[in-house]
A protein has these predicted regions:
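N-terminal beta-strand motif that seeds the catalytic metal site of vicinal oxygen chelate
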Residues: 1-9
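Conserved beta-strand segments that form the floor/walls of ligand-binding pockets within enzyme
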Residues: 5-6, 88, 121
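Aromatic-flanked redox-active Cys/Sec active sites in thiol-based oxidoreductases
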Residues: 8, 75, 91
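N-terminal signal-anchor transmembrane alpha helix
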Residues: 12, 18-25
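A short local structural element in Rossmann-fold oxidoreductases
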Residues: 22, 74, 105
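Flanking helices and flexible, charged tails adjoining ferredoxin-like Fe-S electron-transfer domains
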Residues: 27-63, 67-71, 91-174
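Ordered, amphipathic secondary-structure segments that act as subunit-interaction surfaces
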Residues: 63-86
Length: 174
């Protein structure tokens, strides 16, 4: 299965991944040049944090093997696909209790700013059926998709059928 991998040492904090995510999920047609970055109805599903040492860390949903968000979701709005490993969100089922937000150990999930009635989370750009837009937009190739093998799963302590990311200092394979 595919995983979003992060080489944090290559990230320069440009936020192209954040803007690409917003562009991919916008409701109105247009280009990135007319994208309203302050539109609270179109929030990015990822963000970049600047660390005290000046380095940057891309923060993405890890689509965990044992996702706390799914286990704490009382309405069944969050589920993990056993085939792809992707944690999906069904807005129609969401009861807006935000237990998932409170239980995400990585602080990735958040309530939407506009209505405070739904959760904003990565969907791996499933509509595109290609590389996620954050990956396509990264000029430094700090974000990349990699097929996970059993060997990688053992090394990183992950399920080879999972989707998510691992902070890595290794160069991505092209």
């Amino acid at each position: 299965m595919r995983r979003i991998m992060i080489n944090a040492s290559l990230c320069d904090g440009c936020k192209n991944c954040t803007v690409a995510c917003m562009q991919a999920h916008r409701d109105t047609p247009g280009t990135v040049y007319d994208l309203d970055l302050t539109d609270i109805h179109n929030e990015s599903r990822n963000h970049i944090e600047k660390m005290p040492d000046g380095s940057y860390r891309p923060i993405f949903c890890r689509h965990c093997d044992l996702p706390e968000c799914v286990m704490s979701c009382m309405s069944g709005a969050l589920s993990k696909d056993p085939e792809t490993g992707i944690v999906s969100y069904d807005e129609k089922k969401c009861g807006s209790c935000f237990m998932c937000v409170m239980n995400c150990p990585y602080g990735v999930l958040k309530a939407d700013t506009a209505t405070h009635t739904k959760v904003v989370k990565c969907d791996f750009c499933m509509k595109d059926d290609a590389k996620p837009n954050c990956v396509k937009s990264c000029p430094k190739k700090a974000i990349y998709v990699e097929k996970t093998t059993d060997e990688a799963a053992k090394l990183f302590g992950i399920n080879s059928n999972a989707v998510g990311y691992v902070v890595s200092d290794d160069e991505p394979d092209d």
